[in-house]
Amino acid sequence: MITSPTTWPSPAKLNLFLYINGRTDNGYHELQTLFQFLDHGDQLTITANDSGHITLTPDIVDLPVEQNLIWKAANALQKKTGCTLGANIHLNKILPMGGGIGGGSSNAATALVALNFLWQLGLSDDELADIGLKLGADVPVFVRGHAAFAEGVGEKLTPAQPEEKWYLVVRPDVHIATVDIFTHPQLTRNTPKRSLETLLDSEYGNDCEKIVRMIHPKVDKQLSWLLQYAPSRLTGTGSCVFAEFNSRSEAESILAQLSDNVSAFVAQGRNISPLKETLADYLSAQNRPI
């Protein structure tokens, strides 16, 4: 066990494209999407101990700790391995909840990766991803730490190398429940499947965007504004929208034109997750294999 406090990034992600191809027999949606990480996100500071208990600070209003994905991830790791160690976990929350940029899933993945290291459990990425999949469909991509093309119901991941562009990410002041979008009767569910090579060479889109813009005027307004300046899309099921640029200065020049009451940030796309890079640094410092 490593008992000194360590700090770990919990990065945001974007769905650079998202297409819905159909439904499985049990009602889940089949999709094709491209995940890329951002160099922007939450932070978890974790101190391992021998108490056997997981404590999480600060408290989140209206969310019992046992329902928090960080706590669930730590508890699942204990049960999977029989580990009797504990940890104090402090979350520095930057990413919005319900924004479509992976906040909760990223938090869960960071907890799994960090505690596997601190408790010296030796689980592989595959084993951690299996635990993570039970917590949320997006958790495995954060665990594996590489930009990825996802297919099926999101469980089939192929590493990808999209261009690492700069993004202006804007969060309209609305909370969007994924279930509301995926159950909408007008949602496109029959986009033909295409190869990754074909998709990377095509104009990117998001099959959820039309529905979200229709039922959430604030999203429609913000996306219409961004489209004046650059290619722009919804990420996931929203509410965040993003515009892509070739340089940081271009993105920041448009950010400067936003109203002060609009929540937004500029970040660069990363094909290797900041979490994976941090783990490599800690392993190197411990002289352990990467």
Curated annotation (Swiss-Prot):
Highest taxon listed in the record's lineage: Bacteria
Chain's role: Catalyzes the phosphorylation of the position 2 hydroxy group of 4-diphosphocytidyl-2C-methyl-D-erythritol.
UniProt-listed Enzyme Commission number(s): 2.7.1.148
Binding site for ATP: P96, M97, G98, G99, G100, I101, G102, G103, G104, S105, S106
HAMAP family registered for this protein in UniProt: IspE
Pathway field: Isoprenoid biosynthesis; isopentenyl diphosphate biosynthesis via DXP pathway; isopentenyl diphosphate from 1-deoxy-D-xylulose 5-phosphate: step 3/6
A Pfam family recorded for this sequence: GHMP_kinases_C
Active site residues according to the UniProt entry: K13, D138
Gene that specifies this protein: ispE
Keywords of this entry: ATP-binding, Isoprene biosynthesis, Kinase, Nucleotide-binding, Transferase
Similarity comment: Belongs to the GHMP kinase family. IspE subfamily.
UniProt cross-references to SUPFAM superfamilies, sorted A to Z: GHMP Kinase, C-terminal domain (SSF55060), Ribosomal protein S5 domain 2-like (SSF54211)
Keyword Kinase listed: yes
Record-level Gene Ontology MF annotations: 4-(cytidine 5'-diphospho)-2-C-methyl-D-erythritol kinase activity; ATP binding
Broad enzyme group: transferase
InterPro entries documented for this protein: GHMP_kinase_C_dom, GHMP_kinase_C_sf, GHMP_kinase_N_dom, IspE, Ribosomal_Su5_D2-typ_SF, Ribsml_uS5_D2-typ_fold_subgr
Kinase found in the keyword field: yes
GO biological process: isopentenyl diphosphate biosynthetic process, methylerythritol 4-phosphate pathway; terpenoid biosynthetic process
Official protein name in the record: 4-diphosphocytidyl-2-C-methyl-D-erythritol kinase
Substrates-to-products reaction catalysed: 4-CDP-2-C-methyl-D-erythritol + ATP = 4-CDP-2-C-methyl-D-erythritol 2-phosphate + ADP + H(+)
